């Protein structure tokens, strides 16, 4: 009845989605209909209508099916835990250095996060037991505002806060690790990741031509990495003895942390441990994990580059299809995993690393938890249907698809024990009616596993698993019902503007553009898109073009054939001007991510801190650190308390363009062409890479004096640009030895 009610509730919103879901659910749930009949505490006058022989047969059928569906995944999990022991132990015995450690790019999207939380997350990355010169953190703000939190963060990293304007991206060296702080136009997490990917692709284009050992780690801004997280990832993906170097993606073990303990946080902690180390261990044993969470996912960048077009594709033209919205927006991590599973050439290329741990902040309130689980449920159900109806996945991962199908059928019995408990409390049933076999197998096997994991990881809260076993089915039912009742609302919660609607004068595409102008492209009213949704439907499965896409053959000269074959190369689209030198850019940069229709904003290569403060400052001796002069920061904070300090339009990037492209007044003998990294600008629709030549008629940029409270090591990470600048007063710096060029990449 619950399933039929949910399907009927969904039907008015999206007929396409309801039909797909109905077929899948009826096939899944019908298998366990006998289990429901013989297990539910039905009234006596109904039970008398069933012959005793039939009830006995159904009971044995239910017991056998239930045992198989629990024991087989449990045995697979035990096998995985034995062969890949979980724990925060160091897997690599030798000491890694700048040449033996693969380069790792850490992408951290930021949206309205407290500076203290960000600093804690950044410190956990740069303090890892991993060569700092091989770590490059991309701290990407989803929004262009320069507010107090932004200023406090960059001041902590060592970037001056007294500048009149700030470029879009700034490079700084913090604890010997390279950090790029960027601000992009607000468009959501996936849009922020997309813009960051474009920036990474520009910075590392030449490096990727020769190497395939660049990895990208996606984490959330509130995550705290374990000290050996990075090197354990690299051990399983690249450095393990006998490795074939073909691992495409891995996820780790995410646990929760909180400052205030409660029943909700306790249940979340046990659920994280059980879900990470049980379900994903089973999936890894079967060929691939089905979810690469955005909170902790390591990808091989060359593989991610090939999927960028499909993962970052614009969905405005498909917004009327609710199924596509849930699949690609609410469940973007599951959708990315699906793309990788289809693109992989063989099994066991998408795995879980049982030695890579991180902590994330647990949700404190029930309302926030309800909204979070609503997103998870809608993203899960759409991608699950997509996966189980994709023939390519059944051929490549038969055991995985079979196990997922079995686990979906067993979800029907999730509320059985809760209903049985209610029947015992209300005395409508006796203790003799309890299905002891079901309880012994389900609770017993899971508790043995959780007891072992709690002792192994020293998370003794896992020993309270029986509490989760009783309460979690009820909470999961609430999440499901709430997700169904609010399925038509395309918003992530919180204060929003009025939802955009479509009518006879406004198409769904125009409604989405209106929502974008209001600051949230997902805040639209789906119920007004029904007529358009009946006319066409979005393909449920990924394109056939990505099947087996992850294969980069090596060329005879030793170069990797990492071609971006889905679109024309950028260099083929450029027509160089006469007597203008060609920009030194990789022949095949990822034009997929740059030429998409919503990428109207220019992406600028990051500026070094020295270029904001003067080139000659680093030639002066560095005195002892003086007490911090916080007058400038206090003045800026007072301005922030009255409102927004500064903002710029990311579509035009006035400030960034001024900082990147404004040349200085040159002497008659100094006719120096700006470095390509400072004269490069990508956009869609106009000249892709215009060169801005220095003009003696343009004025010199004016900067405020450098504050003495600047922290961090402001060391450059790109080739030095020799341009005369006005000498500014600043903190004297020591003469540093030039680093090896490869270690700076």
Curated annotation (Swiss-Prot):
Its EC number is 2.4.1.16. It is an enzyme of class 2 (transferase). Keywords: Cell membrane, Cell wall biogenesis/degradation, Glycosyltransferase, Membrane, Transferase, Transmembrane, Transmembrane helix. The chain crosses the membrane at residues 26-46, 55-75, 412-432, 434-454, 464-484. It comes from the Eukaryota. It is found in: Cell membrane. Residues 613-635, 672-745 are annotated as: Disordered. One of its GO terms (cellular component) is cell periphery. It catalyses: [(1->4)-N-acetyl-beta-D-glucosaminyl](n) + UDP-N-acetyl-alpha-D-glucosamine = [(1->4)-N-acetyl-beta-D-glucosaminyl](n+1) + UDP + H(+). Residues 707-720 have a biased composition (Polar residues). It is a multi-pass membrane protein. GO terms for molecular function: chitin synthase activity. This is Chitin synthase D.
